[in-house]
Amino acid sequence: MPIIYMNIMLAFLISLLGMLFYRSHLMSSLLCLEGMMLSLFIMSTLMALNMHFPLANIVPIALLVFAACEAAVGLALLVSISNTYGLDYIHNLNLLQC
């Protein structure tokens, strides 16, 4: 296995561990999610380039679109929680229910 794949997998695992350990604040969780999505994007791009299959190039672009949507929804939730409670704790998400 080339070293670049090991580095990308290590980046994904570090982001996953950050998501597991620092899950009390929404901002740190969003940053860890973005790190995971970035490493998945790079890994899928490298695999699509190695496959030499033209339709495989759609997968990284679709993943990038979903990552942008996830970031937009996460930032909207962060703004909503910050305006309502003044804090960015994840346990405040349960208080937004009607």
Curated annotation (Swiss-Prot):
Swiss-Prot/TrEMBL GO biological process terms: ATP synthesis coupled electron transport
Topology with respect to the bilayer: Multi-pass membrane protein
Enzyme class: translocase
Classification via Pfam families: Oxidored_q2
Location in or out of the cell: Mitochondrion inner membrane
Parts of the chain that traverse the membrane: 1-21, 29-49, 58-78
Matches recorded under InterPro entries: NADH_UbQ_OxRdtase_chain4L/K, NUOK/Mnh_C1-like
Catalytic reaction(s) noted: a ubiquinone + NADH + 5 H(+)(in) = a ubiquinol + NAD(+) + 4 H(+)(out)
Keywords assigned by UniProt, alphabetized: Electron transport, Membrane, Mitochondrion, Mitochondrion inner membrane, NAD, Respiratory chain, Translocase, Transmembrane, Transmembrane helix, Transport, Ubiquinone
UniProt-listed Enzyme Commission number(s): 7.1.1.2
Subunit composition and interactions: Core subunit of respiratory chain NADH dehydrogenase (Complex I) which is composed of 45 different subunits.
Protein known as: NADH-ubiquinone oxidoreductase chain 4L
Organism listed in the record: Trachypithecus obscurus (Dusky leaf-monkey)
